[in-house]
Amino acid sequence: MSFSVTSVFTFKIESTFDEWAAIFDSAEADKRHSEFDIKPLFRGVSKEDPQKIIVIHQAPEGNVQKFVEANGDWMATHRVDLSTMEETSWTASLTKDDCCD
């Protein structure tokens, strides 16, 4: 059974935050997110490192990973350093079957 997961991504960019945010907030990005039923909740920039970005999404389990796989090349053209991407996943509750391999 698929359930909603909140995913927190951090990564580095090779541009300014304003340049990156303009792309993230674009109609094209909205369209690509909606194709995977992804709802962006927050995006921001580190106060300590202007190249470090955080993005928080909510989507059905596995959809954000599918989005990154399908759109990695597009993301890289917007100067996202995919090699720095880190993810954590969060949910409102867990059953024993959902947790901990």
Where are these regions (language model features)?
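Short S/T/G/P-rich N-terminal loop/turn motif that feeds into the first structured element of a domain
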Residues: 1-101
